Amino acid sequence: GENGKVVLRGNNTVSLATAYNQYLKYHCNAHVSWFGDQLNLPATLPVPVETTHRIINGKYRVYFNYCTLSYTGAWWDWERWQREIDYMAMNSINTPLSVVGLEGVWYNTLLRFGFTDEEARSYLVDPAHFAWQWMPNIESFGGPLPKSWIDSHIALGKQVVNRQLELGMTPIQQGFSGAVPRKMMEKFPEAKIQKQPD
């Protein structure tokens, strides 16, 4: 502390959030986790006796995988996402996988390639199976995906990415894997598209 005050420093927003988390843990005996918080803070916040320096190792601290974002994250709303993004920052994450709303990218791209609304939505799988579609090894399972879901998750995805950027994170976005819907062969019969086995 300095002059009886708690002072947290960092060279970026994620470092500051990490410093805050360290202060809560090691000076206030508090805890923030996925499964619950213990934030019974003392009436007067303790001032550390000595300065503590911590270095965050690793330039890129990646978080999430496709399965986490399908099994659990697919059902999160904005409130839950805000908590998760804060949790990431408090735990030094600066490079999260960020694919909320990717179904909207696919939907709109397929429309531009001449798919109907029904065809584009039928290509997309249900939210619990997004991991397999994004990896990519599945299509048209559990659909068609409702347009209301697509629209709401385009908006949610923008909120998630904007918040991650505000905190100085670099979201990992899905690139094009080369996989296309099998229906592309009907729509573009001259194209050289290799069909994978069922």
Q: Predicted regions span which residues?
A:
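Aromatic-lined carbohydrate-binding surfaces of glycoside hydrolases
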Residues: 1-9, 13, 18, 27-28, ...
